[in-house]
């Protein structure tokens, strides 16, 4: 029978503002110990598929240093430290990154971004219906974001063709397909 590993010891290997790594000592089965199991520690993430009354998708384009490219994706962001409501985080991120807001939210659920080497980092997916532009963008210090509006059918085709490469963006579009096309 599969059993959870036993945590013996935990310490910070790296504890910086934007990146934290924990070094765990774990017993994976009786007598078998791993001394250096590293976990990247992240806050949960919210991803927002915002749909306008005209059935358009609100996308953002920004440089992603990890990929080394300018990426087109759905609005998203980390939950702030101490923030415990993913819906409130989703509303905040949508407004900050795009200036759009919505009063109609549907939760698609949460998914693990990396269940092997990351702790926390659950990805919460939301559908924001009838999204409207109500404010200016409010960027974080490290953001420069362009907002793009695409018909849902075009965004879905972009996901299928690989033009949209973020797995969370593709997943959200695929989950929304049946809801929005019926």
Give the location of each predicted region.
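Acidic, metal-coordinating catalytic segment for phosphate/diphosphate chemistry
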Residues: 11-47, 52-53
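Active-site segment of metal-dependent pyrophosphate-handling enzymes
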Residues: 43, 51-54, 64, 73, ...
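Short loop segments at secondary-structure junctions
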Residues: 29-31, 52-54, 63, 83, ...
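A short, amphipathic edge element
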Residues: 1-11
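Conserved hydrophobic/aromatic beta-strand scaffold that supports enzyme active sites
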Residues: 21-23, 49, 125-127, 147-149
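Nudix hydrolase/Nudix homology domain
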Residues: 2, 70, 124, 141-182
